[in-house]
């Protein structure tokens, strides 16, 4: 290793079906298959480069390598993390491993948002487009997930993780209200 080597690397986060379903209600266009997120290499540990506080992925209680946007409690739901090592991408978790991880974190049973319930607006809601009937006729092709600021994507994924935690209140390992 040379001193010229960068201390920042990329991880590619695969967008799963659950994540895609969630994002499709909040954006116009097709969600991407992968999201690339930078992380900082500190010795042998990997710490996320996030707007919030990072965490060391090796300290994940489930034992799997999970990429968090912000603090560890805000784990991305339904995500498979890929490790980028010397320009090669290899899978670090299996599909079964991801499912068991989500289950252990209490994030596996979240429900899709109900469209039109109390007109709850998110960062991805179109302010100009208030009716569902005109969605198809307008065909706004210029607005896709890739065009959105990174912070909007992070907020949507945080909302997804939060929704999963709320649906599992009282069932988790932390001993919620009983």
Curated annotation (Swiss-Prot):
Q: Which parts of this chain are annotated as the region Disordered?
A: 108-178
Q: Where in the cell is it found?
A: Host cytoplasm
Q: What residue spans carry the Basic residues bias annotation?
A: 168-178
Q: Name one Pfam family in it.
A: Pns11_12
UniProt keyword list: Host cytoplasm, RNA-binding
Major location category of this protein: host cell
Q: Does the keyword Endoplasmic reticulum apply?
A: no
Main function: Constituent of viral factories. Binds to ssRNA and dsRNA.
- Protein name according to UniProt: RNA-binding protein
